[in-house]
């Protein structure tokens, strides 16, 4: 015989459960523990919060982009055949019609040149590592080296854009934005994706598209920590502005943004409000 109560419990979905649990004092605590899962299903009210719709395996990722580093041929990509072809002209089959850079366009010929540094095998994997990386060679078995990634870009900027977004043409989400989208955030008070840029000038240009969210929601855009002044914008109050005044200002902005969202329906309006609120919580913590 069917039990209608048990049938009802089996059909009870998560959202209905949270609504029902919220009626009791004990349910309030439980609803708080499960609120992040509910936020993952609907992030309109808290655009910066929530877990993804699946359980991520990684907890955090640190991505180091060494723009302008030495050639991989001098570090870990051992090419012994280059020595056998030393000073021979680069075969046309290698170039395959690829245009050359302005730095080499004036050359009369394009000779093959091997690395000037010695290579040796290291670790149980037998990975070839250059003498330039003695410390890296000691932990080579802990590293995963990919040699299959390539691009047709011959200049730094489009190649860097490709490395960070998977496309030479700007506008796609950066790798950090995809990670933020995939892993979510464990804290409402900290951004899920931050960017550290070098302080020194005169190096390769860095553009915000390298940590942009592209077509993903802007809550996944990287928060760039500045090397001068306030590391994060809006965390410090302007001179003469008290915390209470700041709170009043944010409340007024939230009301204006909410009115704009009701009229236009643009979710980025609420995301901007959430960004200001996060900065305020970082300031108050």
Q: What kind of region is each of these model predictions?
A:
Residues 1-285:
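Ligand-binding pockets and gating/stacking loops
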């Amino acid at each position: 015989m069917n039990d209608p109560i048990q049938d009802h419990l089996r059909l009870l979905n998560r959202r209905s459960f949270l609504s029902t649990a919220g009626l009791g004092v004990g349910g309030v605590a439980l609803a708080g523990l499960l609120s992040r899962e509910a936020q993952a299903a609907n992030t309109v009210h808290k655009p910066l919060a929530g877990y993804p719709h699946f359980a991520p395996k990684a907890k955090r990722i640190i991505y180091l982009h060494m723009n302008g580093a030495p050639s991989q041929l001098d570090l870990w990509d051992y090419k012994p055949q280059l020595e056998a072809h030393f000073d021979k002209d680069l075969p046309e089959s290698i170039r395959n019609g690829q245009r050359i850079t302005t730095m080499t366009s004036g050359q009369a010929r394009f000779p093959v040149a091997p690395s000037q540094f010695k290579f040796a095998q290291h670790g149980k994997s037998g990975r070839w590592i250059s003498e330039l990386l003695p410390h890296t060679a000691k932990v080579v078995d802990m590293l995963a080296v990919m040699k299959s990634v390539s691009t047709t870009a011959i200049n730094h900027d489009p190649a860097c854009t490709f490395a960070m977004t998977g496309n030479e043409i700007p506008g796609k989400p950066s790798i950090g934005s995809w990670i933020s989208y995939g892993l979510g955030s464990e804290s409402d008070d900290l951004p899920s994706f931050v960017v550290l840029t070098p302080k020194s000038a005169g190096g390769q240009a860095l553009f915000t598209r390298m940590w942009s969210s592209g077509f993903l929601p802007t809550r996944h855009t990287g928060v760039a920590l500045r090397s001068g002044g306030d590391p994060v914008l809006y965390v410090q109050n302007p001179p003469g502005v008290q915390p209470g005044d700041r709170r009043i200002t944010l409340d007024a902005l939230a009301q204006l943004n909410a009115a704009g969202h009701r009229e236009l329906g643009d979710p980025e309006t609420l995301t901007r409000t959430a960004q200001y609120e996060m900065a305020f919580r970082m300031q108050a913590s």
